């Protein structure tokens, strides 16, 4: 993750604020958003469907990370001295907060079991050991899609211009759905 400073439409400084995030050819996550708490949230993907890095709290693979804007770790993160906010993710694609500050995330499954999740601090969402359905160890998805739809970006709509007030809108990467 780079912080880029500009002046007069030119890059004047580039600073790495987080490095060593594992990547792969197909599944990388890659979403960055500032939350209502002014922290930077980063969705990282699992490097392969056979990797168990999403379950390893020392790995940055398959996680939602939470950072201060300078790349330091917030004191109130759920895992002490760690950027990990939640784990057990395969391929995070969309993030949005509702008016109450709850974080929702879309996640693409391997060929089915795409998910919409309500993210809780410090919780495990199961990948690659479990998909969609929770148990005492893993958090269940709010919604699971089979066949897969490849969910992408999401946003909450609270306006009054469309007849869809208080709705979560989701774009899909497969087909042509909204």
Please place each PLM-identified region on the residue numbering:
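Conserved serine DD-peptidase/penicillin-binding transpeptidase domain
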Residues: 32, 39-41
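Beta-propeller domain segments
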Residues: 39, 46-178
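Asp-box/WD-like beta-propeller blade repeats and closely related beta-sheet repeat scaffolds
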Residues: 1-34
């Amino acid at each position: 993750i780079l912080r880029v400073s500009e002046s007069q439409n030119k890059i004047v400084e580039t600073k790495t604020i987080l490095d060593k995030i594992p990547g792969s050819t197909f599944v990388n996550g890659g979403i960055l958003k500032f939350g209502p708490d002014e922290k930077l949230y980063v969705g990282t993907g699992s490097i392969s469907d056979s990797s168990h890095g999403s379950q390893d709290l020392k790995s940055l693979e398959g996680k939602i990370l939470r950072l201060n804007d300078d790349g330091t770790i917030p004191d109130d993160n759920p895992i002490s001295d760690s950027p990990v906010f939640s784990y057990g993710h395969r391929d995070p694609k969309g993030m949005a907060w509702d008016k109450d500050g709850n974080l929702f995330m879309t996640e693409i499954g391997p060929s089915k079991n795409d998910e919409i999740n309500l993210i809780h601090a410090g919780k495990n969402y199961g990948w690659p050991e479990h998909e969609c359905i929770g148990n005492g160890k893993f958090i269940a998805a709010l919604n699971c899609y089979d066949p897969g739809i490849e969910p992408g970006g999401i946003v909450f709509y609270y306006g009054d211009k469309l007849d869809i007030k208080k709705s979560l809108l989701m774009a899909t990467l497969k087909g042509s759905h909204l």
